[in-house]
């Protein structure tokens, strides 16, 4: 019987979703991206090869698995083709297995120009930490009903007319409000038409194809990008991304009914990280040698896949995790990077906050309130042994098992999967999402 699983990040992104999606793909007929754009990065380690992906679903490295880019994704066609060529150079067949929704809004040159100019104009304290890739301005165009979509690539005249109108609007903002250079019509149009020749053969009715896969008994894996705490509605607004990163978006962003989402796997690191601006209650010093934060940063190789920026690091925040569990309807958790904590004498779990003199047990919604939150910690013993590469629960040190049990107790949700390294087999399975 077909079963559909949604994988979402429960933190601020970078939770290790790519490896888990790849690991789960053995049981899926297809993998679906349903939100975000090429601002999200995921890294897969397969044998001696490392693949850094932004737009192509992680299932592409599994032979015979179909991959879908749903209507909720904003698409930089030029970047997608560059990514495809890198994969093809590595011997991976992509074009015959990748299907793109005609409803995807297109990221064009003026979107990136707007993104960069706006961020440059902000005061340092107001900077979001955008990747500057045009994601936000493209979603703005979508909501304003002026976006050019993949569908428009089929008609040169329609595309040209819409592009001309959009450039008149956006170039006014760029030149008159932001003091930036205008973006030329020919440059954007010519690149889009050149890309269209390669993109259009991969365009398909994604919603109908996903329905057909399920009807034939095939299971699907929905791959979330970024993380719940970056969600445009539920995250630490305004220090968020421009899309919905939560499990419910899997339905809207791909064209499947919510009743066909059967299991939600929430991915969380054994600690917390964040890239860019915004409040982070459990943040630690990552620069001082010998400190827990510095170990998380260096041992965890905490640098952004897309930007290369150092990630901020801190203790695992269970008040934030519980908020994510509620929002996503998480069925089970997957803990990643447990091995990064190996060797620390003691560990701390944030179980709640003091906010304006009162204790609260869930992350508040406004970033101003989150900034005022002071974490309440519970201290646990660390472990001297290694968890790296462990493949069974019993192979973990007793203190590591106690740490995981405490997370389950406080969050009232089972930990079904534990990742102990980047390779596929460095995984502990307690309950399989496709079998649960």
UniProtKB/Swiss-Prot annotation:
* GO molecular-function terms, A-Z: adenylosuccinate synthase activity; GTP binding; magnesium ion binding
Q: State where GTP binds.
A: 13-19, 41-43, 311, 337-339, 419-421
Q: What biological process terms from GO does the record include?
A: 'de novo' AMP biosynthetic process; IMP metabolic process
The UniProt record lists the keyword Secreted: no
Query: Where is the protein found, in the record's own terms?
Result: Cytoplasm
Recorded coiled-coil stretches: none
Kindly state the subunit structure of this protein.
Homodimer.
Q: Where does substrate bind?
A: 305-311
Protein name (database record): Adenylosuccinate synthetase
What are the binding positions for Mg(2+) in this chain? 14, 41
Q: Which residues form the active site?
A: 14 (proton acceptor), 42 (proton donor)
SMART domains reported for this sequence: Adenylsucc_synt
Q: Which Pfam families match?
A: Adenylsucc_synt (PF00709)
Q: Which InterPro entries match?
A: Adenylosuccin_syn_GTP-bd, Adenylosuccin_syn_Lys_AS, Adenylosuccinate_synth_dom1, Adenylosuccinate_synth_dom2, Adenylosuccinate_synth_dom3, Adenylosuccinate_synthetase, P-loop_NTPase
Briefly, what is this protein's role? Answer: Plays an important role in the de novo pathway of purine nucleotide biosynthesis. Catalyzes the first committed step in the biosynthesis of AMP from IMP.
**Known EC number:** 6.3.4.4
Q: Which UniProt keywords apply?
A: Cytoplasm, GTP-binding, Ligase, Magnesium, Metal-binding, Nucleotide-binding, Purine biosynthesis
Cofactor(s) for this UniProt protein? Mg(2+)
* List of residues binding IMP: 14-17, 39-42, 131, 145, 226, 241, 309
Per the entry, the cofactor note is:
Binds 1 Mg(2+) ion per subunit.
What protein family is recorded?
A: Belongs to the adenylosuccinate synthetase family.
Look up the record and report any one GO term of the cellular component aspect. cytoplasm
């Amino acid at each position: 019987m077909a079963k559909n699983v949604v994988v979402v990040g429960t933190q601020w992104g970078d939770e290790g979703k790519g490896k888990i999606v790849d690991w789960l793909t053995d049981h899926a007929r297809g993998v679906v991206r349903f939100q975000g754009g090429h601002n999200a990065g995921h890294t897969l380690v397969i044998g001696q090869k490392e693949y850094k992906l932004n737009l192509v679903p992680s299932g592409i490295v599994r032979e015979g698995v179909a991959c879908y880019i749903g209507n909720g994704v904003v698409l930089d066609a030029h970047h997608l083709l560059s990514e495809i060529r890198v994969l093809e150079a590595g011997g991976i067949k992509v074009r015959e297995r990748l299907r793109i929704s005609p409803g995807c809004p297109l990221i064009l040159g003026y979107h990136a120009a707007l993104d960069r100019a706006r961020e440059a104009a902000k005061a340092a304290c107001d900077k979001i930490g955008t990747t500057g890739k045009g994601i936000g301005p493209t979603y703005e165009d979508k909501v304003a009903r002026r976006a050019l979509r993949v569908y428009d690539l089929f008609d040169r005249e329609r595309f040209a007319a819409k592009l001309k109108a959009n450039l008149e609007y956006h170039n006014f903002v760029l030149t008159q409000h932001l003091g930036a250079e205008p973006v030329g019509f020919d440059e954007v149009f010519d690149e889009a038409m050149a890309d269209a020749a390669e993109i259009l053969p991969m365009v398909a009715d994604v919603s109908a194809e996903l329905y057909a896969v399920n009807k034939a008994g095939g299971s699907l894996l929905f791959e979330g990008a970024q993380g719940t705490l970056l969600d445009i509605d539920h995250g630490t607004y305004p220090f968020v991304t421009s899309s919905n990163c939560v499990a419910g978006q899997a339905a809207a962003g791909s064209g499947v009914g919510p009743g066909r989402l059967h299991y939600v796997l929430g991915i969380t690191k054994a600690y917390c990280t964040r890239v860019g601006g915004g409040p982070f209650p459990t943040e630690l010093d990552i620069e001082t040698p010998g400190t827990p934060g510095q170990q998380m940063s260096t041992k965890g190789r905490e640098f952004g896949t897309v930007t290369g920026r150092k990630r901020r690091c801190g203790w695992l925040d269970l008040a934030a995790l519980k908020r994510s569990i509620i929002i996503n309807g998480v069925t089970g958790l997957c803990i990643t990077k447990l091995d990064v904590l190996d060797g620390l004498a003691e560990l701390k779990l944030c179980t709640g906050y003091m906010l304006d003199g009162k204790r609260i047990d869930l992350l508040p919604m406004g970033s101003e309130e989150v900034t005022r939150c002071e974490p309440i910690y519970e201290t646990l013993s660390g472990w001297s042994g290694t968890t790296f590469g462990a493949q069974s629960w019993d192979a973990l040190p007793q203190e590591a098992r106690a740490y995981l049990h405490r997370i389950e107790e406080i969050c009232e949700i089972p930990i079904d999967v534990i990742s102990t390294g980047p390779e596929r087999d460095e995984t502990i399975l307690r309950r399989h999402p496709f079998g649960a």
